[in-house]
Regions:
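Helix-turn-helix
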Residues: 9, 17-55, 59
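Short, Lys/Arg-enriched anionic-surface-contact patches
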Residues: 1-10
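Inter-helical turn/loop segments and adjacent helix faces that build the functional surface
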Residues: 133-138, 157-167
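Short, basic, alpha-helical segments at the C-terminal edge of helix-turn-helix-like DNA-binding modules
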Residues: 57-64, 72
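Short amphipathic alpha-helical elements of helix-turn-helix/winged-helix folds
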Residues: 13-17, 91
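Amphipathic alpha-helical packing segments from all-alpha helical-bundle domains
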Residues: 110-133, 141-155, 171
């Protein structure tokens, strides 16, 4: 199966089928037939439906990343994330019905939910990068998971937002990002407090050891 044209056909076929049927009912033979490829060719490129979904999400990532405005660098981290994530909702717009079907299926299928969470977390790492926020290491993973939670909560609003300007989605996204910003600030304050306590405890511990040694008592 040639790339990337045929892969695009498979992705579009999956999203079309998900819009027409419950996602649980979409089978690999149905997908191959809709995409106009053989089942063997489908297997050559994908492990299953979730892999095709991951390809769709990757395409959305690429579209959002390609459209990032350099002027965003002048805005606050929250404002940059708002712009990036809202662009992401706009990129998803043609497939809203399909996404609704997938979300419903994930609520019934914990395995699907876990696989999607992994894919979305990776995607959110790229969205953080697009907003100029580090997504590497343990802190980066924490940020990506947190942003994934924000994304999931706002998506519930977006799926039912019929306003052309997505006013409810914008309001929900702004609210959730402000909440996340407060959590990050609280965590940073806690980290500073712990570091200060650690530094102040070291001299006291050293003094205790010196006193014990002077008295001939091992610690």
């Amino acid at each position: 199966m040639p790339k990337p044209k045929s892969r695009d056909k498979v992705v579009e076929a999956l999203m079309a089928l998900a819009a027409e049927h419950p996602f649980d009912a979409v089978t690999l033979p149905m997908l191959a037939e809709r995409a106009g490829v053989t089942l063997a060719a489908l297997r050559e490129n994908y492990d299953g439906r979730v892999a095709v979904l991951a390809d769709y999400i990757r395409q959305v990532d690429e579209r959002v990343l390609a459209g990032v405005d350099p002027a965003l660098a002048q805005e606050s981290p929250r404002e940059r994330l708002f712009d990036v994530l809202f662009s992401r909702f706009e990129a998803h717009a043609p497939h809203r019905q399909a996404i609704r079907s997938i979300v419903r299926a994930a609520r019934r299928d914990p395995c699907l939910a876990l696989e999607l969470n992994r894919t979305v977390t990776i995607s959110m790492g790229w969205m953080l990068a697009a907003a100029g926020i580090s997504s590497t290491g343990g802190r980066g993973l924490f940020r990506a998971q947190g942003l994934g939670l924000v994304w999931a909560r706002v998506m519930r609003v977006w799926l039912n937002d019929e306003d052309a300007g997505l006013a409810r989605t914008m309001a929900a996204l702004d609210k959730r990002l402000r909440e996340a910003e407060r959590v990050v600030m609280q965590v940073q304050c806690l980290e500073k407090f712990v570091r200060r306590r650690g530094r102040s405890a070291k001299p006291a511990r050293t003094a205790d050891v010196d006193a014990d040694l002077a008295e001939g008592h091992p610690t």
